[in-house]
Amino acid sequence: MLVAEAAERNKEPILQVLRQYLDSAQRGVRVLEVASGSGQHIAHFARAFPHAEWQPSDVDQRCLDSILATTQAHGLPNVKAPMYLDVTWDWKQWGGILPQSLDLLVCINMSHISPLSCTEGLFRAAGHLLKPKAVLITYGAYAINGKISPQSNVDFDLTLRCRNPEWGLRDTSLLKDLGQASGLLLERMVDMPANNKCLIFRKQ
């Protein structure tokens, strides 16, 4: 199993945000996590929401193996087998997920370590797959209307762009525009530890 220190640190703060948008007692809730990574997040969330159905996904086979091992180790029957998913694919290729069938779509720490086409694909698919009034929640470090702060995030952005010119912190104004193009409105930005944010986009 892969273990990411950052995921251990942020899984509980992110869960506290999710609690504001999911009812732990409600049955039949369907959640897709894009770019699930090690599986630590979805295992933590699935324990907190045992009546929801959680679908993890990733494009990296090592992550898919780790997700399976992590969820099996925790004995989580409400987590489906991890799905291979390239987020740039057309939404109709997203594992047979039906249009307007998801109650929540979660994406943690993907947009800044992937080409912009991945973030564009995420918003396009969310516009089709989320139920009306359902939400897309993204988490990470972002530029806010053209400005990156504090200095640690400026340095982080530079490090990412040195590793891959297609990577880097995405601007919330760009994400707002991508959301609107897919019928998603940026409803809220939540300050998180370590200069990160959760962005809440609601499907109209």
From Swiss-Prot:
InterPro entries: DUF938 (IPR010342), SAM-dependent_MTases_sf (IPR029063). It comes from the Eukaryota. Keywords: Acetylation, Phosphoprotein. Disulfide bonds: none annotated. The keyword Phosphoprotein applies. Coiled coil: none annotated. The modification Phosphoserine is found at residue 149. The keyword Secreted does not apply. Signal peptide: none annotated. The modification N-acetylmethionine is found at residue 1. Pfam families: DUF938. Belongs to the UPF0585 family. This is Methyltransferase-like 26. The lineage of its organism: Eukaryota, Metazoa, Chordata, Craniata, Vertebrata.
